[in-house]
Amino acid sequence: VILERGADVDTRQADVERFWETGKLQPDSNVQFGEGGAGTFSDGKLNTLVKDKFGRNTEVLRTFVRYGADPAILYQAKPHIGTDVLSRIVKSMREEILRLGGEVHFHSQVTEILTEGGHVTGVKINAAEELPCEQLVLAPGHSARDTFSMLYENQFPMSAKPFAVGFRVEH
């Protein structure tokens, strides 16, 4: 079961286009939130980790190809798939999850993690519906500060990851 706080990628694309045209922001369906995450509307450049001696990104690239990316990304030094292709790939991945019997629920923000005796027992969705579970993978993505606040307030252990700052010089 996948719970996505934002909209599906097609609805999200329309919401993003409307934002660029009118300035009307949909809080949970925009460049940051929705199916595919913040990277869906990036320029489609892929970090290949070509110098990684463990080849950890190879399977990710193969997965992109399996769902519609150009096979050239498997050997290009600086692969690029583009936002238009990435959106189709994200949708194809969702369709495969559904075909295999999985579930994807949009506009379903995890607002509480339910526990008993120190173990996860479920989640509360949109502060209303409860979904039982024994295991939980929480992937809040970019800009989900309210999710981190909820974790902090409920004393879930967290640790900061290394922080990197970069900049681009164009000439």
What is each PLM-predicted segment?
Residues 1-45, 49-171:
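Residues forming the flavin
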